[in-house]
């Protein structure tokens, strides 16, 4: 569960290392985001020669949460931390590589590119 002011690590090669959630998109009163949800983030920590700079605002999709995801068969998929992948205005990933596993819940029409780039899909 990601909410406003949550810190996330970045799971792609855009150069951003850490981002801060500034808004959960999808309704005026929406408070929490889970895996597959789109959020607005501010880059808080970035590599020196990366594609993104500190302080820039981007959309991002949540790919891993420490809270976990309940599946239909009753299983629960949890991760050690929260992670997101940065998106451009067309909701396409900015980076060309994805680090770490992603969940099957991302396999929608919007995020098939992220699933295909990921080294492991749980």
From Swiss-Prot:
UniProt cross-references to Gene3D superfamilies, sorted A to Z: Ribosomal protein L14
GO cellular component assignments: cytosolic large ribosomal subunit
Task of the protein: Binds to 23S rRNA. Forms part of two intersubunit bridges in the 70S ribosome.
The keyword Metal-binding is annotated on this UniProt entry: no
Regions that span the bilayer: none
Record keyword Endoplasmic reticulum present: no
Database matches in SUPFAM superfamilies: Ribosomal protein L14
Quaternary assembly: Part of the 50S ribosomal subunit. Forms a cluster with proteins L3 and L19. In the 70S ribosome, L14 and L19 interact and together make contacts with the 16S rRNA in bridges B5 and B8.
GO biological process: translation
InterPro entries cross-referenced by the UniProt entry: Ribosomal_uL14, Ribosomal_uL14_bac-type, Ribosomal_uL14_CS, Ribosomal_uL14_sf
A Pfam match: Ribosomal_L14
Entry keywords, A to Z: Ribonucleoprotein, Ribosomal protein, RNA-binding, rRNA-binding
Family: Belongs to the universal ribosomal protein uL14 family.
Name the UniProt record assigns to this protein: Large ribosomal subunit protein uL14
GO molecular function: large ribosomal subunit rRNA binding; structural constituent of ribosome
